Amino acid sequence: MSIAGPVHLDGRERAEAVGTDPMVTIEQVRDLASTLPRSYEALVRDRVKFRVGQIVYLAFSRDETLMGFAFPKEERQALIDSEPDKFLMPERSDQRYNWVVVRLEALDEAEMSEIVLDAWRMVVPKRVAVEHLGD
């Protein structure tokens, strides 16, 4: 008799297991981000970005396959090491910021929602987040 260890599925495998489309689109992100207080979309040098005030908390690559997002710098390496096929270091010029990059094809909708909400929460005043999310 063989005892299997824990099964780890990536975003695509999880989505296939539950019968959903694994690829998150910019439209899904836009739909969520547009509901968040003080959040707005901006087009900067042909790239879609979402901001609160002047602070960017989400940004897409020009081809919309990658999404950068606000994330604590001190936790960044652990996140990337946990799923290196999904998460990437930002470009060298952005490494001084609280920022990580994710491949959209590797995300499911639940993960995308968590990332977007956490990134927004990092840049919005705490009371605004509490009022909106009830945390």
Can you say where each PLM-predicted feature lies in the sequence?
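Charge-dense, helix-prone N-terminal extensions
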Residues: M1-D135
